[in-house]
């Protein structure tokens, strides 16, 4: 077991609005993560480092584009919890020793967060895989998911989904270039790539 600290340097990076609310939510999301990850410190470290990187990029997008009207506080909160479901998945390369297919981590995380009373955060979980997954994608690829659309709808969902594509949990110390992120998302199909490119034009 390692002694690396997995906590972000500040409860809400970049000074998100609402100091008291920020600290309060920091306590809440850490309690949620600890509830599921306390016995898996290596996986917790991967989750926290990845989530903080995604949150920071998402906040930079919010700051660069105030015209989007994104809820900065919610963006940070949801980014820190968007991958909570990986603990149930079978992906030993990133210390996940569960039983579920990795493609399911979004809907698994959504179920976990709904149980915690966090409906809006749950929607981010289930809509962030790839550039969102359509029912047609799921049927065509024969993924073990409900035949429903899991596509980012709100601006906050879109920002987090986009920011997430620049960071891999396999290499938590690296940030992908735009070209690398595009290559990753292209694996999900042309529709996903087109959504990503639209976000790229809007957010960069």
Give short role names for the model-derived ranges.
Residues 185-204:
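Charged phosphate-binding loop/patch that engages nucleotide di/tri-phosphates or the phosphate backbone
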Residues 21-102:
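Acidic/His-rich, divalent-metal-binding segments that scaffold phosphate/diphosphate chemistry
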Residues 67-174, 178:
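Divalent metal-dependent catalytic cores for phosphoryl transfer on phosphate-bearing substrates
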Residues 14-19:
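Residue-identity detector for glycine
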